[in-house]
Amino acid sequence: MAQSKEVPSFRWTQSLRKGLSQFTQTVKSDILKDAKLIADSIDFNQVAQVQRVLRKTKRTDDDLNKLRDLNIEVDRLMSMKSVQKNTIFKVGDLARDELMELASDLEKLKDKIKRTESNGTNAYMGNLPQSQLNRRSEILRTLGFAQQGGRPNGIVRVWDVKDSSKLNNQFGSMPALTIACMTVQGGETMNNVVQALTSLGLLYTVKYPNLSDLDKLIPNHECLQIITKEESSINISGYNLSLLAAVKAGASILDGGNMLETIRVSPDNFSSLIKNTLQVKRREGMFIDDRPGSRNPYENLLYKLCLSGDGWPYIGSRSQIMGRSWDNTSVDLTKKPDAVPEPGAAPRPAERKGQNLRLASLTEGQELIVRAAISELDPSNTIWLDIEDLQLDPVELALYQPAKKQYIHCFRKPHDEKGFKNGSRHSHGILMKDIEDAVPGVLSYVIGLLPPNMVITTQGSDDIRKLLDIHGRKDLKLIDVKFTSDQARLFEHQVWDKFGHLCKQHNGVIISKKNKSKDSPPSPSPDEPHCALLDCIMFHSAVSGELPKEEPIPLLPKEFLFFPKTAFAL
């Protein structure tokens, strides 16, 4: 599934419900308590004003202030809320590979959401009359253009505000608010609303309810007529009585069902929640879809979990939270030394349970081998560093010191197989079968054990900087030689001819990327794959103007870097 863009959305939802069932709970009484308090205390004239604001095609700072003021009042009344709780996951909270996977997914989710919001909110389409909007839609259909993001009539709702950060966390439905609005504004009893929403929630246990399902339920639950038939879009408040808001409310008031909506995050269970989520993700082949648009179930869960380390990710008020998920949850791969316990002190919780804190990392013997290799490097002399594949999911790293004719070269198995295959096809040519036996943790240990404040030379430093920072190595200094591609690869063929035998992991076929412009000639395919080690040698050759005369020596033996292949007897 990681290679496919198709998402079996409901299957993923069911798998996440099953995998995270231990974190779900029954919250019906708490939701109804908040709903009754909101229904009795809120000025619904103010609610109606905010709902009118959200129907406008262009909203201003004054409109945003009305929404924020009402959100503050609702937040004050609710017991179910998320509070500002920033979390930094470190080694020990999660395994190193889990930390890198989390950091990578948050970075990709950030890119996707920012592209989605840019596409959806920054283009104001004007105030054409309805007749011209209809005519424009007809012209677009005639020309073969599919309807783009936005509303069916072509109007894009935008926020024209000075400080867009004030929009953060002011949206999203809350079941207590949905129930209160349906009760008061629909002129219904709360019991009728609860019964109707429960029917939607029960349907949600077997499928995603749609507008056709809603129409079939209305004869038995007339209060559902208040639900809008318009499609949801980004930056639409919880005061809009959408089908999604109603389904969420129905899911949260079920007695059971292991619904994700009932998860509560706390400092005590946050790391376990993330660990279990990543396990389900790998088992089901879930991924961050890089296409702008709605979030898939994994993306939605990850965003909500990481927004705050304390609260209700799906159903609580979150208007007091500052920042986005990638701001409030981060990763630090710096390895902290274990504190020496005082004599007679009680064992740590993990030790009481018989757990080995090193299981996800290298053994002490393996760590000593890496330390010995690093100690051979001379920080006062030039050291080249290069990586291959994504900066938060690298598959290859090399350190090369020309003066001492030595190098450190290691690999790791990627988490993002789809991204890896793309990189293999267009850049490094590494095949999964050639690195699937790489010993996990070596690459992170190499970075973590580099001497403090060491100066490293690179060709292109952005990706390397991000990788070092995520490992907590902001102390390491980078010098970027900033060659053009032609300058950097001047000695490419000679390096591969003379030193190509040093690395046997680049066996794929490199395919040139297609240019977006039809008029542009296709970009030339590199003659050779990108190898972190050979690229370091090649970059140094370009600087010095000649090839190294002697073959460099590996500081980490190959048998240390890979698990032995299983032998089968016939």
Swiss-Prot record:
Zn(2+) binds at residues 396, 503, 506, 531. The keyword RNA-binding applies. Coiled coil: none annotated. Residues 54-236 are annotated as: Binding site for the cap structure m7GTP. Its EC number is 3.1.13.-. It is found in: Virion; Host cytoplasm. Keywords: Capsid protein, Helical capsid protein, Host cytoplasm, Host-virus interaction, Hydrolase, Inhibition of host IKBKE by virus, Inhibition of host innate immune response by virus, Inhibition of host RLR pathway by virus, Interferon antiviral system evasion, Manganese, Metal-binding, Ribonucleoprotein, RNA-binding, Viral immunoevasion, Viral nucleoprotein, Virion, Zinc. The N-terminal region is important for the cap-binding activity while the C-terminal region contains the 3'-5' exoribonuclease activity. A CCHE zinc binding site is present in the C-terminal region and may thus contribute to the substrate binding and/or the specificity of the exonuclease activity. HAMAP family: ARENA_NCAP (MF_04085). This is Nucleoprotein. It comes from Tacaribe virus (strain Franze-Fernandez).
